[in-house]
Amino acid sequence: MVVYLVGAGPGDPELITLKAVNVLKKADVVLYDKPANEEILKYAEGAKLIYVGKQAGHHYKSQNEINTLLVEEAKENDLVVRLKGGDPFVFGRGGEEILALVEEGIDFELVPGVTSAIGVPTTIGLPVTHRGVATSFTVVTGHEDPTKCKKQVGWDFKADTIVILMGIGNLAENTAEIMKHKDPETPVCVIENGTMEGQRIITGTLENIAGKDIKPPALVVLEMLSMFLKK
């Protein structure tokens, strides 16, 4: 028995890796999230498909339930795929699932995916680094675990470009915190449904972006913008 944690990429089914496709074709069982484009499941023909539905604020199953289910399916099948949107280790809680497998002595392999933090800005021609302008970037969650005793995100980032994932529900709160450290006129770009049908680009500033009509899934990019979005 072996479990593959597979990254499905940022949304466009053509952005999944060849290795991910090959693993899906051999799968006995696939546990998949909502962020993983369901069109990708066509590669798992004949496999048992289990929807575990993890979205911010709308969890069909809790993380503990997913861990338990993953272990149970692994013990009953030769090859189980845990399909996750983006990359399993970029705010995908893949590490928690690996620890659950290790505790039960279950073998696993990892298949990286294209993270939306880079893939989505690239799709619209917005680089997160650029020679002479941006030599660093930070990827941060905009939705910390509400059960934490203390928040870890301080928002005083020194990177030239900041990419915020899962941040639309807390956009007003997050931008207010960022404005304690950055100019309110700092340019902001939000990309809805990145790489997928219905992709939409919304631009503004730290001061006004939260007032725009924005719906998840979407990511937020700060600063590395002006010279590219005008083209």
UniProtKB/Swiss-Prot annotation:
- Top-level taxon in the UniProt lineage: Archaea
This protein's pathway: Cofactor biosynthesis; adenosylcobalamin biosynthesis; precorrin-2 from uroporphyrinogen III: step 1/1
Q: Which GO terms describe its biological process?
A: cobalamin biosynthetic process; methylation; siroheme biosynthetic process
EC number(s)? 2.1.1.107
Activity control summary: Does not show substrate inhibition at uroporphyrinogen III concentrations of up to 20 uM, in contrast to SUMT from Sinorhizobium (previously believed to be P.denitrificans).
The alphabetized UniProt keywords are: Cobalamin biosynthesis, Methyltransferase, Porphyrin biosynthesis, S-adenosyl-L-methionine, Transferase
- Could you give the subunit structure recorded for this chain? Homodimer.
Q: What is this protein called?
A: Uroporphyrinogen-III C-methyltransferase
Q: Which organism is it from?
A: Methanobacterium ivanovii
Gene responsible for this protein = cobA
